[in-house]
Swiss-Prot record:
Binding annotation for (6S)-5,6,7,8-tetrahydrofolate: L117, G121, H122, L123, E242
Family in the record: Belongs to the SHMT family.
GO MF term set: glycine hydroxymethyltransferase activity; pyridoxal phosphate binding
Subunit-structure text: Homodimer.
Pfam family, one: SHMT
Main location: cytoplasm
Protein known as: Serine hydroxymethyltransferase
Modified residues annotated as N6-(pyridoxal phosphate)lysine in this record: K226
Pathway assignment: One-carbon metabolism; tetrahydrofolate interconversion; Amino-acid biosynthesis; glycine biosynthesis; glycine from L-serine: step 1/1
Native species: Thermus thermophilus (strain ATCC BAA-163 / DSM 7039 / HB27)
Record gene name: glyA
Catalytic activity: (6R)-5,10-methylene-5,6,7,8-tetrahydrofolate + glycine + H2O = (6S)-5,6,7,8-tetrahydrofolate + L-serine
Gene Ontology cellular-component annotations: cytosol
Necessary cofactors: pyridoxal 5'-phosphate
Site positions for Plays an important role in substrate specificity: H225
Amino acid sequence: MVSTLKRDEALFELIALEEKRQREGLELIASENFVSKQVREAVGSVLTNKYAEGYPGARYYGGCEAIDRVESLAIERAKALFGAAWANVQPHSGSQANMAVYMALMEPGDTLMGMDLAAGGHLTHGSRVNFSGKLYKVVSYGVRPDTELIDLEEVRRLALEHRPKVIVAGASAYPRFWDFKAFREIADEVGAYLVVDMAHFAGLVAAGLHPNPLPYAHVVTSTTHKTLRGPRGGLILSNDPELGKRIDKLIFPGIQGGPLEHVIAGKAVAFFEALQPEFKEYSRLVVENAKRLAEALARRGYRIVTGGTDNHLFLVDLRPKGLTGKEAEERLDAVGITVNKNAIPFDPKPPRVTSGIRIGTPAITTRGFTPEEMPLVAELIDRALLEGPSEALREEVRRLALAHPMP
């Protein structure tokens, strides 16, 4: 931590408090991770001082010679990482990436089809409380009651009935692989654009552990944190440069002004790290840890939605244990284990309560946790949920966390 912050005592204490929480706890929120020191250095660099409206070679401000090269480097690395012909690294977030893509491909009132939030989708895939549900007519698809897997027959039936302009494949709480080929065939059948939101599994795609949507999607959006382990931000990719030009105009000047070039530098670092061989091994362990942790909890009587996972996350149905997601989140938080309450498919409880929790392994894997340690993590989770919080259990969690240093 920067020592000069000590002059601002109130803020220094709060940052120190959060650093202590991260260092002494087990971070199991699927959308969180720990960036490298190199990413933090880039994000905290002098690039934060520079305004750079526009794109490399076409700025509205002078003095962008180095900035242009930084952003161009990030673009080229993103393209190489995912095999894309075009990339935009300026979105401030995944939500803004989705907004720009929708605005480039649709007009207000057009039909957007995406995964229902209650089935594992994201707010930006058509939730009525989100811009996507306010600007567009929304049709939502879900999962089968028997398997809890995406119902492709329903997807096709809804697409044929409603003729959406855009079909979104992607989710924030779906633990299985996506059949992008089948989605593209459905999109082509109804004349829709296929947009894949790979925010959660982008790092796994980069490592070759999840199907790559680029050969099938018209446009791919993502965040740059989560499994990609970069700074918080957004990314848009496509193999259609003409579509890319339309999206460029929607990012700037459409919905954003000056890009955050210090964050873009952090993205460039993360893309470089993800291009290294060791990132593949890291990602392999993320998936293996998720599988082993899900199996260990299942052996303790917890119902795992879909019966397991293919990626970095899984959902736990707590109804057999007589707990709500809210209760579980609070009990685990009290001993230093961080998860989030999450709806399960066909959940009878409201979103602020839920019947389940979502668990992910990117962050603990970054700290060096191995598959062999997942039964112990499952034991700690089980004890916190069934016995309730205690100082003794909190100390066990703390010791385990401190044995695995943060980057």
